[in-house]
């Protein structure tokens, strides 16, 4: 085993050791927050029309009649086994809700991240290279302005302009009714399902429905990426390695991409990855705005109905996803820059 792979392995084990207490703290917070909510969650979720006997039966089935420490142990066991109980409002297994609606959220967030990086990195690199020019000023203005707009407001503007005034794109749902009826839910990511079934003619409809919510969410995140890339490229351009590359007669584009950007990559990866985690919270508002059938839309539905069993399961998965993304960012940084490992 080489020293490089050995140091990377030690770094991975160290990060995993830190993740365990972090996850335990997060799970404890989720459990406590769900238990301090006012009122009886069983009665509230079912409309308050239960008799006392029916309420007792429901509480026993959900485990709410047991001591808190027993409920906490049961909750940790559910996390370990991946079984989060059954929703109170529609009697669906929470894992089924996560599988069916989580795929739509994954499709939206991944598409939004591609747009954020595709817009933010080139624009930030250009602004960092052309410091104190009109291009730089416009890039800075874009970064501040686009990130300051609430994602739901930008979504409403996009719906108004492209859906109602210009009538170019659909403004809600994941697909038209006919297309959705044709597809078999192999993965619940409809574009992928269409490819699996060979329904290539349905893909334009699916892309049209995906475009507005993905662009809305992606543009908001791109504001952070632009400013981050600009600052780090500007700092990297002052390095001796950049001057050495120029002295060798390399083209300015090569100097920026291969030398300045590469050395600015670690903080860019870190913050961009954290923005990917924050996409989950932005996806909740985006899904509600565009009636996108993702897990965020379901979360709002269950919150409105005070179905805390469903809410607890969804928030738990969100929290674990954020921790997993953070761990992945650390590993990518350690791979890109060996100095991070020590």
Name the predicted role of every residue range:
Residues 22-73, 162-202:
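Hydrophobic alpha-helical transmembrane segments of membrane transport/permease proteins
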Residues 30, 34, 38, 42, ...:
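Membrane-water interface at transmembrane helix exits
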Residues 122-123, 135-187:
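Hydrophobic alpha-helical segments embedded in or immediately adjacent to the lipid bilayer
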Residues 6-10, 102-135, 151, 182-342:
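Alpha-helical transmembrane segments of integral membrane proteins
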Residues 48-63, 154-167, 212-217, 254-271:
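Hydrophobic alpha-helical transmembrane segments
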Residues 1-65, 95, 99, 126, ...:
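N-terminal signal-anchor/first transmembrane alpha helix
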Residues 1-8, 43, 65-121:
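An internal, D/E-rich "acidic patch" concept
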Residues 27, 31, 74, 125, ...:
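Transmembrane alpha-helix boundary and packing residues in multipass membrane permease domains
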């Amino acid at each position: 085993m080489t020293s490089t792979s050995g140091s990377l392995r030690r770094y991975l084990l160290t990060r995993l050791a830190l993740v365990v207490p972090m996850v335990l703290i997060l799970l404890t917070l989720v459990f406590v927050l769900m238990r301090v909510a006012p009122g009886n969650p069983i009665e509230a979720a079912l409309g308050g029309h239960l008799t006392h006997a029916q309420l007792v039966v429901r509480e026993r089935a959900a485990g709410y009649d047991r001591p808190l420490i027993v409920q906490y142990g049961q909750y940790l066991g559910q996390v370990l086994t991946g079984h989060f109980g059954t929703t109170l409002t529609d009697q669906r297994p929470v894992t089924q809700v996560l599988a069916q609606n989580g795929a739509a959220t994954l499709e939206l967030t991944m598409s939004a991240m591609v747009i954020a990086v595709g817009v933010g990195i080139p624009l930030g690199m250009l602004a960092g290279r052309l410091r104190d020019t009109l291009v730089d000023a416009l890039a800075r203005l874009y970064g501040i302005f686009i990130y300051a707009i609430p994602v739901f407001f930008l979504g409403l503007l996009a719906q108004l302009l492209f859906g109602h005034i210009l009538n170019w794109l659909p403004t809600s749902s994941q697909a038209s009714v006919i297309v959705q009826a044709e597809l078999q839910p192999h993965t619940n990511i409809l574009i992928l399902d269409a490819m699996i079934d060979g329904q290539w003619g349905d893909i334009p409809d699916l892309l049209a429905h995906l475009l507005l919510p993905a662009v809305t969410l992606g543009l908001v995140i791109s504001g952070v990426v632009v400013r981050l890339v600009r600052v780090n490229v500007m700092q990297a351009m002052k390095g001796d390695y950049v001057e050495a590359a120029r002295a060798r007669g390399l083209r300015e584009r090569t100097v920026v991409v291969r030398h300045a950007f590469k050395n600015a990559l670690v903080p860019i990866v870190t913050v961009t990855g954290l923005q990917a985690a924050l996409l989950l919270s932005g996806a909740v508002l985006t899904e509600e705005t565009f009636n996108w059938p993702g897990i965020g839309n379901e979360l709002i539905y269950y919150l409105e109905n005070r179905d805390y069993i469903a809410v607890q399961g969804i928030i738990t998965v969100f929290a674990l996803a954020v921790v997993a993304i953070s761990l992945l960012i650390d590993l990518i940084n350690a791979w890109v820059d060996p100095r991070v490992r020590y």
